[in-house]
Structures are given as structure tokens and as C-alpha cells.
Amino acid sequence: MSKSSKDLLEFWEDQMKLSHTSSNYFFRKSPSHYHMMLIVMNSYKLNENLSVEELKTRLFKTSRPKSALMIKEACDKDFFYLEKTGNDHRKKYVLPTQNFINEFNEYLKTLKNLSF
């Protein structure tokens, strides 16, 4: 097995060990969960406001009720939180929690260090 393949395998096995103690399990439940994580983190990194309604619309192949449930679960598990800003208090924005931001950045740093 090549070194890069071995590194990737070790990385994956380490991630699976964390699966029940971190966001790994939640965001790997389905492609839609992973897609939701990427949308929220991309908006956060670009400093863009992402409303709950916009997130529901952008999650392809996921019904609006299922999208709402996924967002609620992510908030309940303290990965995301909802914030009301501006004059329209009916509009809620989805933001990652600081703990999740730290976890996500650590995940990206580890991925970048893998050589292929």
C-alpha cells in the first residue's frame, strides 16, 4: 500500500473512531447532511448571511420538511444556531457554533496535510 493510501486509510479510521463523539456521525448520515454542512460553512467563510429558507432551497433532493428537521437537529446538537438580525425578525439565519467551527477547521487542516 502506498504511503498516501495508508495515510488516507489512517485518517478515515481515526475519523470513524470519533463518529459517535463529534459532528462526524451527524454530518455523514446522508449526502444531504454533508451538503448542509458544506453550505453553512461556505456561507460562514464568505461572511454571507444564510437564511433558514435559503438553506432549505439549496439542499437539493431533500424535501422542505426534511430540510427543516435536519437544521433543527443540527441546532439541537449544538453544531449550528439560529440568529435573528435586522428589522425583519421573522427571518432567521443559520450560523455554525464556535465549537463546530473549531472542529471543522481541524478536519480541514488534517485533510490538507494528507499527501496524494
For the regions a protein language model found, what residue spans apply to each?
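Short acidic, hydrophobic short linear motifs in intrinsically disordered regions
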Residues: 46-58
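Short amphipathic alpha-helical interaction segments
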Residues: 61-76
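Amphipathic alpha-helical dimerization/coiled-coil segments
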Residues: 19, 105-116
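A short, conserved structural fragment
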Residues: 75-85
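Short, cationic-aromatic polyanion-contact patches
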Residues: 85-108
